[in-house]
Amino acid sequence: MVKFCPKCNNLMLPKDGKLKCAVCGYEEETTAEGSKEYEYKEHLENKKEKITVIESEGLETLPTTRIECPKCGHNEAYWWLQQTRCADEPETRFYKCKKCGHTWREYD
């Protein structure tokens, strides 16, 4: 059963035998029987990332930027964006050195 906060209409979450709104702090007592109804479980899955590797063909069409390669020190690289995490998180920026071909990433 899902319960929403009567003050701000956000989802109430179980905490220490009570239901609590994470937004406004409103709390509501639950009965012993009702507390099982609101039990909160979080399941994490071990997800493997699938990362696209950009081969040398087609690199000329990618934008370039001035950034130092951590491997050879060259100051120019191709770059592209790719969604590697949840959709509500920012994209990951990948770089590929124009000189040595080393690829690395930066998270925003």
From Swiss-Prot:
Zinc finger (TFIIS-type): 65-105
GO terms for cellular component: DNA-directed RNA polymerase complex
InterPro entries named among the record's database cross-references: DNA-dir_RNA_pol-M_15_CS (IPR019761), Rpa12/Rpb9/Rpc10/TFS (IPR012164), TFS (IPR006288), Zn_ribbon_RPB9 (IPR001529), Znf_TFIIS (IPR001222)
Xref: Pfam families: Zn_ribbon_RPB9, Zn_ribbon_TFIIS
PROSITE patterns assigned: RNA_POL_M_15KD (PS01030), ZF_TFIIS_1 (PS00466), ZF_TFIIS_2 (PS51133)
Family indicated by similarity: Belongs to the archaeal RpoM/eukaryotic RPA12/RPB9/RPC11 RNA polymerase family.
Keyword Cytoplasm: no
Residues that hold Zn(2+) 2 according to the record: 69, 72, 97, 100
Protein name: Transcription factor S
Residues that, per the record, bind Zn(2+) 1: 5, 8, 21, 24
Family matches, as Gene3D superfamilies: 2.20.25.10
Gene Ontology biological process terms from the UniProt entry: DNA-templated transcription; regulation of DNA-templated transcription
